[in-house]
Amino acid sequence: MGAQDRPQCHFDIEINREPVGRIMFQLFSDICPKTCKNFLCLCSGEKGLGKTTGKKLCYKGSTFHRVVKNFMIQGGDFSEGNGKGGESIYGGYFKDENFILKHDRAFLLSMANRGKHTNGSQFFITTKPAPHLDGVHVVFGLVISGFEVIEQIENLKTDAASRPYADVRVIDCGVLATKSIKDVFEKKRKKPTHSEGSDSSSNSSSSSESSSESELEHERSRRRKHKRRPKVKRSKKRRKEASSSEEPRNKHAMNPKGHSERSDTNEKRSVDSSAKREKPVVRPEEIPPVPENRFLLRRDMPVVTAEPEPKIPDVAPIVSDQKPSVSKSGRKIKGRGTIRYHTPPRSRSCSESDDDDSSETPPHWKEEMQRLRAYRPPSGEKWSKGDKLSDPCSSRWDERSLSQRSRSWSYNGYYSDLSTARHSGHHKKRRKEKKVKHKKKGKKQKHCRRHKQTKKRRILIPSDIESSKSSTRRMKSSCDRERSSRSSSLSSHHSSKRDWSKSDKDVQSSLTHSSRDSYRSKSHSQSYSRGSSRSRTASKSSSHSRSRSKSRSSSKSGHRKRASKSPRKTASQLSENKPVKTEPLRATMAQNENVVVQPVVAENIPVIPLSDSPPPSRWKPGQKPWKPSYERIQEMKAKTTHLLPIQSTYSLANIKETGSSSSYHKREKNSESDQSTYSKYSDRSSESSPRSRSRSSRSRSYSRSYTRSRSLASSHSRSRSPSSRSHSRNKYSDHSQCSRSSSYTSISSDDGRRAKRRLRSSGKKNSVSHKKHSSSSEKTLHSKYVKGRDRSSCVRKYSESRSSLDYSSDSEQSSVQATQSAQEKEKQGQMERTHNKQEKNRGEEKSKSERECPHSKKRTLKENLSDHLRNGSKPKRKNYAGSKWDSESNSERDVTKNSKNDSHPSSDKEEGEATSDSESEVSEIHIKVKPTTKSSTNTSLPDDNGAWKSSKQRTSTSDSEGSCSNSENNRGKPQKHKHGSKENLKREHTKKVKEKLKGKKDKKHKAPKRKQAFHWQPPLEFGEEEEEEIDDKQVTQESKEKKVSENNETIKDNILKTEKSSEEDLSGKHDTVTVSSDLDQFTKDDSKLSISPTALNTEENVACLQNIQHVEESVPNGVEDVLQTDDNMEICTPDRSSPAKVEETSPLGNARLDTPDINIVLKQDMATEHPQAEVVKQESSMSESKVLGEVGKQDSSSASLASAGESTGKKEVAEKSQINLIDKKWKPLQGVGNLAAPNAATSSAVEVKVLTTVPEMKPQGLRIEIKSKNKVRPGSLFDEVRKTARLNRRPRNQESSSDEQTPSRDDDSQSRSPSRSRSKSETKSRHRTRSVSYSHSRSRSRSSTSSYRSRSYSRSRSRGWYSRGRTRSRSSSYRSYKSHRTSSRSRSRSSSYDPHSRSRSYTYDSYYSRSRSRSRSQRSDSYHRGRSYNRRSRSCRSYGSDSESDRSYSHHRSPSESSRYS
């Protein structure tokens, strides 16, 4: 073992062709002779050429291709230079020799491998102790000099894959003569000390840099290992890494025990190494220097002599350090208010989960207790604790966490983190005020103060640097999430989850879901999707607050969805008022609500959600308002009993989906609120979002979910695993219910299924659907409509975007309506099953809206009545539209959603065309049944909330036309006041929709007048009102589309593939059009092309919407080629309207041409009537739309809206009336939408709608975004600042995407609104094409947009590719990606996004184009990144696209996430 006997070798390193020094290694040839021989021979190059690589077996000229700060630097790939090559001197790989030596210190030389016994030539040099690598990698040497070179390399900037940007090469290498060994040893003695010192300094610098780079590294690390979770928190990491890592270094042994042990270990190690290296003589020299360096580092400060001293210094340094973070022991330092919050987030998570159980405990007491809990976690347990908390919340969180954790606990981590972060954010904000904040809060406060709005999401991050890392990593890596989740994920993440949940819960109800609810909600597919949408919306309004609730809500989506609904709703209100408290409640409620979504539904939920939401987040599970919802949920569950087994399955799926959505929401919120963080998060968030998206994709539900998620604002991340789960579950749902994911989509598409399911368990699907809807809706409602405006309606239409908004109200109404629906659905369920299958594609969208209303019942009624109502009920619809608009409260909206869907074909169209008429009738029924509820719900929603709601609804509307209807219904209350004439307009819209076949012109004239009156009436909610108007338009169109969709879907069930031709023929019919779209994507492409002239002209406006829907539908049903064609068309231009339109138009074009066209015209007319306001909004909205377009490249809807604007502008030039509208709108759009222009061109038809919608939505979008995110009013200083921040942030994540997204933020909101509406249509399509589903989601990601967009884009793109491969999945993912960003940005954006998404769904390129338009570089970047991530996360995401595929994708997503993270 003589050190002298140990061989030494050297590397001469150059960085960017500048020599920086020599690294000397000593190899433990006495311990690992074979490994050492391999290394030595590779240094000397004496072995000639490799057998497998054919290259010279020598390290000379090789690079250090992977550099992870505070972890290691890796090289030795002499053949490929990227980590994929290299071979040993023995040929290929050789076995792991032994694991005697441990990675217990820095500067050890160890073999890299690809698994067991796969040692080649690649090695790595640790820069921190890495005990997690023990038993995995063979340590065979150590560095005896050149530590500064290693540190220099370690500190190089790296890309997302940890590749240093600089060229780090071994210019020379060789084996040293044994004689120099003594000198080397001498050097070694000094250098080890120096090494130690270097290590220390490296650590210190590393520690400080660790905050930023450590985030990346830890994100990666997390991706790689969950072990790093403890380190994941920056503060902990800094302290802990500085302390622990450095301690291990000091020790050189793995013992991170007392300093005495450490020093002893160090001494032993030193002695050992010196003995090994040389003689024990080195001991004294080596030992003292180490302490000195450490002394500076503070960690091992006294290591030199006093081992206790280090502790004292540690403590003292810790105290100073601790002010920013936790003490090394993990103990929260009271002195620092920052970390104080650290625990509460977890405690918040705990609180959220535990509070549910122990709501009686006073918040401050709980916080203290949780703080104690956090105490342990601060070190690294925090996340674990969080996990535990999550698990404790298992009833809510557990489904989330178990599902998430078990499924993809990266989801849980992410979701947890996001949810917690969000909840934390809101809670923290509240607590900051209370000053009961924990460490996290202190940090958060700092960060929050800086980016309070922006960092709400980041709050998670700030709350814990680790958390932030965690968050970032969450977004960045599934491992991140996982680790986050694992370590402190649930705790911190939980707290974060709450924060994120608030933001992302809404944004990613799934994120909150993330843990488990996320999955559930999303899994519930519609639940998630809706939850997500809602969540996002809520997220926007009270992004964080909702997110949080959503997190829980989504988490619980299965059971919680219901709870989620009411909490969301409440959360929405609270979100604005008490984001923090509401979130937990919301989460809890979401969880519980999911269970009883149906029974609790509309009537009670409006009250309960408010009640639920109002209870502080502290009320967690035990909330009383919550309990009524929960009881109702249980009632729903009773009804859902048949579905319960499925629901259980869905629970997982939903949880996944929810997780995904939550992730998304969180991401989106984070995105909005934390562009910067989100840039970091963006990756993770995006990933999550993709996850979410995946989930969304997984089922249309996912799309919706995402839309909601997106609406909610944060998109992000952690969605992947849940997606896997959700997908798994959703596959269940999809199959069972068109997959839970499908559940959402499936809710639409599965509306038949849903009817079946509802029949199976009227409560279950309702529960699930409604839960999802609730989740989404509630999120949306919570954030936007805390009041639970037409939750049902919103849930349906807004399912994606609005669902979040109207989650509560929808939940309530959904529950009530679900109950009624369930009954009706039971009656008509069978009819609907057949119908629904047809509807599935179209009806998916339709169903979403309808489902959201009385999902089952309404849908069945809608479907049954659809035809009747279509002819006979149109007047009714008109009236109901009016009453919807007037009441537009939850009950009315629930009912109205039908009526509104009828009124607003856009809105209901997505749900299903059949719903248009059916919905009228059902609407009548439900309106009769729930007018009070809706009214009350709507009424309960104050104008402020109304503004929120409006915004969110708009966003929702953007996101899904079905959402549009909901949005408008939801807006009903605010809109009632503001949209008094808008309601009339919508009634007229409904009439017109009915009359559309009779006369477009009449409608056009009618609509514009009313629109004008309404448009200006609600200046309060500038964006909101416009969004509402857009919702009107979209609702009308969507209603029609959904009617058609539903009818078509029914047909589709019967004539799935036969209908391709048949439906094209039927395309003359509204029903056929939608189904044909969905079914006949191939046919559609042809049909689009063939029908394009006719449909294009007449249906241009509708075509936009329909195109999006069709694109979405096409994507799922259509082949990738078709999608590509559509997308290309979309990308192409206004022609996208043409092809895309043709897509929707071809089926819908003939029959629907009149109606949708009129709808569009109406929308446009309304917009035209409000040209000034609309233009103003449109400018914003267009900006948003553009950004959305860019963001919304995924956001087909958004892009489509912009595109629709563009396309309709262009196409509608033919349609002069529309063109005028568009011209007014489009001009701002062109100005603002320069970025969006290409995207808009891509989705021109959709964009027109979005434009029309966006103008209304835009302010709303902005507001929603801002509100959801930061509760900043558009135009306010904060808004401006935030925009700037987002702009800065977005470019960071995705230069183009970010930039575009920032402007797009408003646009995104508006875009999202239409997009959402569209998304709904899309979602239907998406149901078929999970891809479409994703589209929606992405809308939500607007905040996340900047980074998220890059990620979302990437994901979406990857998915788009995937989608191509699996058109649905990828497209969906792609779209979702965008949607996420977009949604995050703003619901409106979601809408825009959705069209884009749709477009994107059609063609990856369309989205890409949009994205490119928005951020071509971002897109490319994103795209590549997304590609990688997509592979990682989009894989899942892709899988999210297909319900069935989605499920497996969902699983993929988990891995994907992991992959992505790693």
Swiss-Prot record:
Modification sites for Phosphoserine: 379, 401, 416, 463, 471, 613, 648, 866, 887, 889, 891, 907, 1077, 1146, 1203
Any Pfam family matching the protein: Pro_isomerase
Region (Arg/Ser tandem repeat-rich): 1311-1348
Activation and inhibition: Inhibited by cyclosporin A (CsA).
Residues the record lists as Phosphothreonine modifications: 1155
Biased composition annotated in UniProt, kind: Polar residues: 403-421, 932-969
Compositionally biased tracts (Acidic residues): 910-922, 1022-1031
Keyword hit for DNA-binding: no
Keywords: Cell membrane, Isomerase, Isopeptide bond, Membrane, Phosphoprotein, Repeat, Rotamase, Ubl conjugation
Entry keyword Nucleotidyltransferase: no
Location of the PPIase cyclophilin-type domain: 10-175
Chain intervals with Basic and acidic residues compositional bias: 241-250, 258-286, 382-402, 497-507, 775-800, 823-870, 885-909, 1032-1072
InterPro entries: Cyclophilin-like_dom_sf, Cyclophilin-type_PPIase_CS, Cyclophilin-type_PPIase_dom
Annotated region (Disordered), positions in chain: 187-591, 607-627, 658-1072, 1129-1156, 1169-1215, 1251-1462
Top class in the EC scheme: isomerase
Reaction(s) catalysed (UniProt annotation): [protein]-peptidylproline (omega=180) = [protein]-peptidylproline (omega=0)
GO cellular component, as recorded: cytoplasm; nucleus; plasma membrane
Record's subcellular location: Cell membrane
Bias-annotated ranges (Basic residues): 221-240, 329-345, 423-459, 543-568, 754-774, 988-1013, 1377-1388, 1425-1435
Biased composition (Low complexity): 198-213, 524-542, 699-725, 736-749, 801-815, 1331-1351, 1359-1376, 1389-1410
Single GO MF descriptor: cyclosporin A binding
GO-annotated biological processes: protein folding
Cross-link (Glycyl lysine isopeptide (Lys-Gly) (interchain with G-Cter in SUMO2)): 323, 578, 581, 639, 656, 666, 1057, 1163, 1177, 1216, 1225, 1258
Protein role: PPIase that catalyzes the cis-trans isomerization of proline imidic peptide bonds in oligopeptides and may therefore assist protein folding. Component of a putative tumor-recognition complex involved in the function of NK cells.
Protein known as: NK-tumor recognition protein
The species this protein was found in: Homo sapiens
Taxonomic path: Eukaryota, Metazoa, Chordata, Craniata, Vertebrata
